[in-house]
Amino acid sequence: MKSLWLDIGNTRLKYWITENQQIIEHAAELHLQSPADLLLGLIQHFKHQGLHRIGISSVLDTENNQRIQQILKWLEIPVVFAKVHAEYAGLQCGYEVPSQLGIDRWLQVLAVAEEKENYCIIGCGTALTIDLTKGKQHLGGYILPNLYLQRDALIQNTKGIKIPDSAFDNLNPGNNTVDAVHHGILLGLISTIESIMQQSPKKLLLTGGDAPLFAKFLQKYQPTVETDLLLKGLQQYIAHYPKD
């Protein structure tokens, strides 16, 4: 049985098609603030895939999600938008107001939380998100600007310093302004993660585009890099979704 999984973010639309739990197709595209139009261009392709259901993670507002829903009706198969709950599949949400937790973070936690394990789950995307779990209890977390947001903020507020797209490649003191900026930003984020990891024993799991970079500097914590963590969380969500 084939399923379609959509991850609709603020700037990108990602999709996976799976069959018998195996990914058979995956793509990610910028949607230029118009995800519904991008999806409209993909509908004919999806229509010929023999899909049986659709699971969606979307950070969009209600109006945009309704447009997405209308377009997907053309496929004439069940569509489920994942939502954050106070409790779901045994997982307790750590936010006072669960709906304020990003659906991407919730699904990442749902993908890995288990009774006798504690996790530090880090999403290395547009923001650096950190979520902590103790068994099946989500403890809340942290949100920080990522490497590039921090660098861009510094460029905007620093006169006379032109900073090219250099690699965030090590934590040594910089011997020039470019290296000092890049190494300093990376050191700040790595130090934050290390501080959290030192507070109590927990497994470290990294996901998102910069996950391999952060893993390189966090080897003493034996990090796991999970590329499709949100997909796994979305699959978990649908597996526990009430049947009609």
Swiss-Prot record:
EC number: 2.7.1.33
Subcellular location: Cytoplasm
EC category name: transferase
Cofactor entry: NH4(+); K(+)
Gene Ontology terms for molecular function: ATP binding; pantothenate kinase activity
Residues given in the record as ATP binding sites: 7-14, 126
InterPro entries linked to this entry: ATPase_NBD, Type_III_PanK
Cofactor note: A monovalent cation. Ammonium or potassium.
Keywords of the record: ATP-binding, Coenzyme A biosynthesis, Cytoplasm, Kinase, Nucleotide-binding, Potassium, Transferase
Gene Ontology biological-process entries: coenzyme A biosynthetic process
Domain of life: Bacteria
Quaternary structure (record): Homodimer.
Protein name per UniProt: Type III pantothenate kinase
Annotated source species: Acinetobacter baumannii (strain ATCC 17978 / DSM 105126 / CIP 53.77 / LMG 1025 / NCDC KC755 / 5377)
